[in-house]
A protein has these predicted regions:
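Extended hydrophobic leader/signal-anchor segments used for secretion and membrane insertion
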Residues: 1-164
Length: 164
């Protein structure tokens, strides 16, 4: 069993390296706690180019709208055209309370955002430690959200899919 797991990890690493060299995948290091407990500082993830409209729960990598070259990793909670309301610690999309099994802590402060057809509303899973999400920087333009996180490859004990 141990050798088959090692072989699988070597195969995965080879595939990641090959695809990354061909520009189909991107490696990314998680540097902050805003996505904990899903993603922790020191985790390494794989992202693929985002080709279709994001779904609620997808984790995206996008450039900070006010700091060129600085990228953020956040989860989609509001979809294009929706109204997102944060009230009494809960997130609502078009008047429905969202089930957010990934969220760590209540969502504050209260507010209302009407999303344009080409924008999404993103939040960090660790709501108390996520300063660079849509509560503070506004909705994210889909043009800027170029990468979708699809898996974690480090640490070895946490290898696998991430997201929903």
């Amino acid at each position: 069993m141990r050798s088959s797991r090692r072989l699988a990890l070597i195969g995965t690493a080879t595939l990641v390296a090959y695809a990354g060299l061909r520009g189909r995948l991107r490696r990314y290091e998680i540097a902050e706690e805003s996505m904990a407990p899903t993603l922790l500082p020191g985790d390494y993830v794989i992202a693929q180019p985002r080709r279709e409209s994001p779904q609620r729960g997808d984790i995206l990598i996008f450039e900070h709208p006010h700091q060129a070259g600085f990228e953020l990793v956040k989860r989609v909670v509001g979809l294009p055209g929706e109204q997102v309301v944060i009230a009494r610690g809960q997130v609502h999309a078009n008047d429905a309370v969202l089930a957010e099994p990934w969220a760590d802590g209540p969502t504050l402060p209260d507010g209302t955002w009407n999303l344009d057809p080409d924008h999404v509303f993103v939040l960090g899973d660790n709501r108390a430690r996520s300063a660079g999400d849509s509560r503070w920087i506004g909705p994210v333009n889909l043009h800027d959200a170029r990468w979708k996180v699809v898996g974690r490859y480090w640490p070895l004990g946490s290898v696998g899919r991430v997201g929903l």
